[in-house]
């Protein structure tokens, strides 16, 4: 939280650790892209990071305006920079901020990199090296033109235009303002934008495109007669999709629809990746298409590694992050929304119709996610449970136990539950999935009982 953990002193410490790491990897000289989302004091944090980097002989490539995380990622790859620093708290409330470090390939830093950086973070953040002690000058860069040009290569904008569909875009006052809508508008596609001004408070709530927070997007869709609403979070790495009738399409289903769509239209069949907590509809589609499935721990960095190795058609998580082949190894909410527009335009079907088609193809899947706060006593007991091998929970017979991340219990009927303890608060996240709405509600209740009994 800003002014608590996220202070000028701690920023100095973190960026100093990054600078030391960069210099250790590139002693002959290096360049680092620095970007941010629209949060309060972001400009000052970028200036501070640039000052520290120059003190270590590293040239800062500064993005002046707020920019989407995937655009920053694409820019550092395009410029062949040696890393990227992004000041963002993504979809978290406005009082939070954070520092994200990306490696030269545009991917989120893997654990071995973050551990190396942590080891180089100084105890004291009161001072930093003298700025420009070696005459290093910063440089200003603009990621928007090249990033939008790349999206034009990926998305069939002429198809969307010819279909005549209208689109509503909601950037949630975030970093994607004037990105998705500018791209669509320049291609001659009717688009209405809401929440398109800078607001460091994001309307007074977390910039997370979900549920009731999309009501103004829905209202704009109804007024404009739009076929689809696309939204992005604070730094535009996550997406929110609203169907023609105002129904929110949960990210699990968006990932499945786009996986099916890309195999059908691009002909790619080189693999698919999903986190352990993401719908098994992806497993079923992979089996249907005879495509290799990669199930990863939660955290997009693992999917990013597979994208870099060209092993995937698409990779994604239930938390609304995805990317595709030949694109950045980073979550891209802008790309996700535009691909949904293309799928609706080409197939001339709503996303719910496309989902029903998938149910007919591979069976029905109903995912659910719940969070439960734990007392110290309950957490201690439950942590021990996570190391056990239960044969059944509340009458559900366990077929297998998966420990890729947390504990995932797969049952005889194909339904499953995954438990993951939060690393920052006394909360357990519970992911459940069954073949019917009623079934997943009952399963989720049984999963809850197993925690507290």
Give the ranges of each region predicted by the language model.
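An N-terminal, well-structured beta->alpha segment
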Residues: 1-51, 55-56, 136-167
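N-terminal small/polar loop signature for handling phosphorylated ligands or for N-terminal nucleophile
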Residues: 20, 28-97, 182-242
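Proline/glycine-rich low-complexity loops and linkers
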Residues: 64, 119-149, 244-316, 323-324
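Gly/Ser/Thr-enriched, mixed-charge loops and adjacent short helices
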Residues: 97-224
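Gly/Ser/Thr-rich active-site loops/lids in small-molecule metabolic enzymes
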Residues: 110, 193-195, 247-266, 333-341
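Phosphate-binding and adjacent anionic-ligand microenvironments
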Residues: 227-228, 268-453
């Amino acid at each position: 939280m800003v002014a608590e953990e996220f202070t000028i002193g701690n920023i100095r410490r973190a960026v100093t650790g990054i600078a030391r790491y960069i210099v250790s990897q590139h002693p002959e000289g290096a360049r680092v892209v620095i970007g941010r989302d629209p949060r309060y004091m972001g400009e000052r944090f970028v200036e501070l990071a640039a000052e520290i980097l120059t003190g270590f002989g590293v040239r800062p490539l500064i993005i002046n305006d707020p920019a989407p995380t995937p655009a920053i990622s694409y820019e550092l790859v395009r410029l062949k920079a040696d890393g990227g620093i992004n000041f963002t708290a993504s979809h978290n409330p406005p009082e939070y901020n954070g520092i994200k470090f990306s490696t030269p390939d545009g991917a989120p830093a893997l654990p071995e990199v973050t551990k190396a950086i942590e080891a180089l973070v100084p105890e004291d953040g009161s001072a930093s090296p003298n700025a420009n002690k070696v005459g290093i000058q910063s440089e200003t860069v603009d990621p928007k033109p090249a990033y939008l040009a790349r999206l034009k290569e990926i998305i069939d904008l002429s198809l969307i235009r010819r279909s005549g569909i209208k689109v509503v875009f909601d950037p949630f006052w975030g970093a994607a303002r004037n990105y998705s809508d500018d791209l669509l508008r320049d291609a001659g596609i009717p688009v209405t934008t809401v929440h398109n001004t800078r607001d460091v408070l994001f309307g007074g709530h977390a910039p997370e495109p979900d549920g009731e927070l999309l009501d103004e997007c829905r209202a704009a869709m109804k007024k404009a007669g739009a076929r689809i609403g696309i939204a992005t979070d604070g730094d535009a790495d996550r997406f929110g999709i609203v169907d023609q009738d105002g129904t929110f399409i949960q990210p699990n289903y968006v990932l499945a629809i786009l996986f099916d769509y890309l195999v059908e239209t691009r002909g790619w069949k080189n693999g698919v990746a999903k986190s352990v907590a993401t719908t098994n509809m992806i497993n079923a589609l992979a089996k249907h298409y005879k495509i290799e499935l990669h199930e990863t721990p939660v955290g997009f960095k693992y999917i990013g590694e597979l994208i870099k190795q060209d092993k995937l058609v698409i990779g994604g998580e239930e938390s609304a992050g995805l990317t595709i082949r030949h694109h950045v190894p980073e979550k891209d909410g802008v790309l996700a929304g535009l691909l949904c527009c293309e799928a609706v335009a080409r197939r001339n079907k709503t996303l719910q119709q496309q989902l029903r088609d998938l149910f007919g193809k591979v069976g029905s899947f109903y995912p659910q996610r719940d969070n439960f706060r734990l007392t110290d006593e309950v957490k201690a007991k439950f942590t021990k449970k996570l190391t056990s091998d239960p044969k059944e929970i509340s009458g559900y017979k366990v077929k297998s136990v998966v420990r890729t991340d947390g504990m995932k219990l797969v049952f005889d009927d194909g339904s499953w539950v995954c438990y993951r303890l939060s690393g920052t608060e006394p909360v357990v996240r519970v992911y459940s999935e069954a073949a019917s709405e009623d079934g997943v509600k009952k399963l989720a209740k049984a999963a809850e009982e197993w925690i507290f009994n």
